[in-house]
């Protein structure tokens, strides 16, 4: 539940805060022991020992994920009830996986189109650089974003928003700083290694701000770390993984598949 974002994004040491506690109880007291049952919000609140208002956010999140559905009896004195899709956690999770893969397939097509626009470097590493082996935490948020056009800027905006690199705070996306950093620094120059200071200078921003966007691209797997081969500066720099968007996206897809496989095994154990 923590890995898919349901319990929030705070540090694990805050795991007992109200949101996480209610989220875990929702599964351990209600959904897992009674997959065949539909629940009203009042019944859930009583089982979880919280006010009704504390249940709504969790239900909305799980409905958007595709894990829960609602039954409407159609009678005023018989309120709607929420339940697991197909009355089964494994089958409900199959639907979540299908949705994730459908999103991924659409973004695959966008990435392939963009790869033809941007081209590729002659080598997987920038000249004079060595790979800097450091495993960055993989963090991706797949969401469905409708197509807005076939222009490169529109495709890149959709791709980045679909994997969580761009957010609603960045509209218009094509004019935003994270867009310009990804586009101008890394996609248009797949042969070059950039330090955080160089990215900050180019984007006319602070080093911490540049690092925030670089770290997001690292967590997506879009960028890789490198250093000077001769042992001199830079000791730490960043480049487009594999020297092309096509290669970088392939690595992202592979990691998503591994994550989905691991989640499926956990769901099977819970069932």
Predicted regions and their residues:
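Short alpha-helical segments that sit at the start of domains
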Residues: 1-28, 141-183
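Short, cationic-aromatic polyanion-contact patches
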Residues: 19-23, 73-98, 172-178, 228-254
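Short helix-capping/hinge SLiMs at alpha-helix to coil transitions
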Residues: 31-37, 58, 186-192, 213
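Short acidic, hydrophobic short linear motifs in intrinsically disordered regions
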Residues: 35-47, 190-202
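Short amphipathic alpha-helical interaction segments
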Residues: 49-64, 204-219
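A short, conserved structural fragment
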Residues: 63-74, 218-230
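Amphipathic alpha-helical dimerization/coiled-coil segments
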Residues: 90-134, 243-271
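Charge-rich interaction segments
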Residues: 129-147
């Amino acid at each position: 539940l923590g890995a898919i974002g349901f319990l929030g994004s705070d540090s694990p040491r805050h795991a007992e805060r109200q949101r996480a506690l209610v989220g875990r109880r929702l599964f351990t007291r209600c959904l897992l022991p009674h997959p065949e049952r539909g629940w009203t919000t009042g019944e859930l609140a009583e089982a979880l020992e919280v006010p009704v208002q504390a249940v709504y956010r969790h239900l909305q999140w799980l409905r958007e994920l595709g894990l829960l559905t609602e039954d409407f009896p159609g009678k005023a004195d018989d309120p709607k009830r929420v339940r697991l899709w197909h009355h089964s956690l494994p089958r409900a999770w199959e639907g979540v996986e299908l949705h994730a893969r459908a999103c991924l397939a659409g973004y695959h097509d966008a990435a392939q189109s963009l790869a033809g626009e941007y081209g590729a470097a002659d080598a997987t590493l920038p000249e004079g650089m060595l790979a800097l082996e450091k495993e960055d935490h993989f963090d991706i948020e797949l969401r469905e974003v409708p197509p807005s056009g076939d222009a490169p800027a529109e495709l890149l905006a959709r791709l980045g928003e679909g994997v969580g690199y761009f957010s609603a705070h960045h509209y218009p996306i094509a004019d935003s700083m994270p867009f310009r950093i990804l586009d101008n620094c890394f996609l248009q120059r797949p042969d070059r290694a950039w330090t955080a200071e160089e990215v900050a200078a180019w984007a006319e921003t602070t080093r911490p701000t540049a690092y925030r966007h670089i770290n997001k691209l690292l967590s997506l797997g879009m960028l890789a770390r490198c250093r000077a081969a001769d042992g001199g500066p830079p000791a730490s720099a960043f480049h487009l993984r594999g020297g092309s968007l096509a290669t970088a996206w392939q690595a992202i897809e592979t990691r998503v598949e591994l994550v989905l496989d691991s989640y499926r095994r956990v769901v099977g154990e819970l069932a």
